[in-house]
Amino acid sequence: KLGKFRDAREELHKKDEPYRRAANSDFIIYLLTLMAVAICIRTFIFEPVQCIGDSMYPTLMNGEGMFTEKLTYAVCEPQHGDIIICRYPYHTEKCVKRVIAVPGDRISISDGAISLNGEKLDESAYWSGYIEDSEMPEVTVPERSLFVVGDNRNHSGDSRHVGFIPYCQVKGKVRAVMTPFSQARWI
């Protein structure tokens, strides 16, 4: 009896072979499509980024995972106060900084404070300290460039040290903190 059962099972498998192959190839196509969509979303729309260091304290803490959106700056320019992910010229690592000045703005640092277009910048929402050892004569931000700083002014390598950030080095706008989940919030 076992031989007849085995023969019947093999016959059934032979009949189902084309259907199983089609189902397997459909599944593989589905997985490849899903992977391509995920790669496109990460490359062109959203990207998770981790905050490394304390340069954005207290707004962002070291180790927090952020949600970065990339489409905004494809249709509009960065604005004062935006928190962005960028690369410094001649550097490969990404960093997170706040936009302080946009093209055409005049910026200077004196007496421990930043002045924008001749007026002391109101930074009370994210900075309440005194900028130590940082005097900078007035400069004008060139076209298609930004002046960025970390919220933790005295512990941040930023435009005061590396110069203006060209638009082409802006990688996205920080929209939210995702991790740790207990600290999740919109920016």
Residue ranges and their predicted role:
Residues S110, L116-G118:
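Short strand-turn-strand beta-turns centered on an Asx-Gly dipeptide
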Residues K1-K94, I165-I187:
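Protein maturation boundaries and topogenic segments
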Residues V96-I100:
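Short beta-strand-centered aromatic/proline hotspots
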